[in-house]
Regions:
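Catalytic-core regions of glycoside hydrolase
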Residues: 1-127
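Aromatic- and carboxylate-lined catalytic core of secreted/periplasmic carbohydrate-active enzymes
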Residues: 87, 105-180
Length: 180
């Protein structure tokens, strides 16, 4: 069924020293397994990670050349936001346009997409409060129980649709140059 090609061992937001040990263990005992990681600091181990997502504050460390090299090697590179930065983000107090901007930024920077850590990690009563501990309101979820959407999700989806349109147009433009 192709599960091995789709599976990833996730190692998120860990110091490089811990990542190096884990990667060495994986390479030794299960070299066929691929690794995904969200990284929240500049890191020298990105070349060893099949599916890497830097936090937006470090996204500029991935030049167009680096992204092309990773893509040619079969690696995926997205970026993410989490409980930081305050802007742009998808918090309940964020201007809705910020959520849409996230997909457009991914396209503009040449990333393969955008990583969102939580879709529906609901708090006790998400219809009454979107707060979870000290995290910004709404960080844990984009949709509500019972099939309820949110303006944050709808605008993020719009931005991801824009991302996909841009990706398709770029592909058509490349093919047109080759043909024509």
């Amino acid at each position: 069924k192709g599960w091995l090609e789709r599976a990833r061992i996730g190692m998120d937001e860990r110091p490089d020293a811990l990542m190096r040990g884990a990667l060495a263990t994986l390479h030794k005992h299960a070299p066929e397994l691929k690794v995904a990681s969200a990284i929240n600091h500049p890191s020298s181990i990105c070349d060893e990670i099949d599916d890497v997502s830097p936090v937006i504050m470090y996204a500029n460390g991935f030049s167009p050349e680096t992204l092309a090299k990773r893509r040619a090697a079969g690696h995926k590179t997205t970026y993410y936001v989490c409980c930081g930065p305050e802007r742009p983000n998808t918090f309940t107090f964020s201007p809705p346009a910020e959520a849409e901007w996230l997909g457009i930024f991914a396209a503009a920077q040449g990333f393969d997409g955008f990583l969102r850590w939580a879709w529906c990690s609901w708090v006790e009563d998400p219809l009454q409060s979107t707060d979870f501990t000290s995290w910004p309101s709404g960080d844990c979820f984009l949709v509500y129980p019972g099939g309820r959407s949110s303006i944050r999700f709808e605008r993020l989806r719009d931005g991801l649709e824009d991302f996909e349109k841009i990706r398709l147009i770029r592909g058509y433009a490349v093919r047109a140059k080759l043909i024509g």
